């Protein structure tokens, strides 16, 4: 039996509020994270992802509080990322009620962190978040044509995005959260070529993110190899509902969780 496709709203949280911009800039307030999380749970979201975009020390304590409050009200799996640098950070988030933790920049600086986390907490708890973009003109060429970026897509990490996903799998992560920085907030559809290339390179689940603008954008991402589809602003501002996305996915011949 095919595994049901997961539909995941993503909430970027800054100082205890949900924010959304294009390519992480021009952030607009999109509401209270716990209220939004409860709404998405009621609307049929399969999971939720919180990304802490404040990632300062003050922001950290606030984020743990948001996770605690959310876990009290919401009973679907919760992934939390942003500023995760150590096993201690992961331990705190899991104790607060997160089910999974996504790791990004800190793993680029120290890849063995992924192995440490996977061995200590289990692969199912560790998500590698890859902020990928097409190599810009004049950039360092990469075999796949896609590079890993840091700092909200503004800096190149100088490594190939597809090879980095493969390395993450080899180091024991359970999923890849693949975010197209070219697509982030643009609503022009997912980067299907990026999804295909990563899908062919890894056997663990791939969550596609970046570019969703309408319900019809989701089935092509699944056809390209995504096991789960993630979006943010179209859900927060009420442009698209989770049930509309699921209807499109079912109409295209895929299974969803009812």
Swiss-Prot record:
One of its GO terms (biological process) is L-histidine biosynthetic process. It comes from Corynebacterium diphtheriae (strain ATCC 700971 / NCTC 13129 / Biotype gravis). One of its GO terms (cellular component) is cytoplasm. The active site is at residues 12, 131. Its EC number is 4.3.2.10. The lineage of its organism: Bacteria, Bacillati, Actinomycetota, Actinomycetes, Mycobacteriales. This is Imidazole glycerol phosphate synthase subunit HisF. Keywords: Amino-acid biosynthesis, Cytoplasm, Histidine biosynthesis, Lyase. SUPFAM superfamilies: Ribulose-phoshate binding barrel. Belongs to the HisA/HisF family. Heterodimer of HisH and HisF. The gene is hisF. HAMAP family: HisF. Pfam families: His_biosynth (PF00977). CDD domains: HisF (cd04731). Pathway: Amino-acid biosynthesis; L-histidine biosynthesis; L-histidine from 5-phospho-alpha-D-ribose 1-diphosphate: step 5/9. The keyword Amino-acid biosynthesis applies. It is an enzyme of class 4 (lyase). It comes from the Bacteria. GO terms for molecular function: imidazoleglycerol-phosphate synthase activity; lyase activity. It catalyses: 5-[(5-phospho-1-deoxy-D-ribulos-1-ylimino)methylamino]-1-(5-phospho-beta-D-ribosyl)imidazole-4-carboxamide + L-glutamine = D-erythro-1-(imidazol-4-yl)glycerol 3-phosphate + 5-amino-1-(5-phospho-beta-D-ribosyl)imidazole-4-carboxamide + L-glutamate + H(+).
């Amino acid at each position: 039996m095919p595994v049901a496709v997961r539909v995941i709203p993503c909430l970027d949280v800054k100082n205890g509020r949900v924010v959304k911009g294009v390519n992480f800039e021009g952030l607009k307030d999109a509401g209270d994270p716990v209220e939004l999380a409860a709404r998405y749970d009621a609307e049929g979201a399969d999971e939720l992802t919180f990304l802490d975009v404040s990632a300062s020390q003050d922001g950290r304590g606030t984020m743990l509080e948001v996770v605690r409050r959310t876990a009290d009200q919401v009973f679907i799996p919760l992934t939390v990322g942003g500023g995760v640098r150590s096993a201690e950070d992961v331990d705190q988030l899991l104790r607060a009620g997160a089910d999974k933790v996504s790791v990004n920049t800190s793993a680029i600086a120290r890849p063995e962190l992924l192995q440490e986390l996977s061995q200590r907490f289990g692969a199912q708890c560790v998500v590698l978040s890859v902020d990928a973009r097409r190599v810009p003109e004049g950039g360092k060429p990469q075999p796949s044509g896609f590079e890993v970026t840091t700092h909200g897509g503004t800096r190149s990490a100088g490594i190939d995005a597809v090879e980095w996903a493969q390395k993450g799998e080899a180091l024991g992560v359970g999923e890849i959260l693949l975010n197209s920085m070219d697509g982030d907030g643009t609503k022009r559809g997912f980067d299907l070529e990026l999804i295909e290339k990563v899908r062919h390179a890894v056997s663990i689940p791939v969550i596609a993110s970046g570019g969703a603008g309408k319900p019809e954008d989701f089935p092509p991402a699944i056809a390209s190899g995504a096991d789960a589809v993630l979006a943010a602003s179209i859900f927060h501002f009420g442009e698209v509902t989770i049930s509309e996305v699921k209807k499109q996915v079912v109409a295209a011949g895929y299974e969803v969780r009812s």
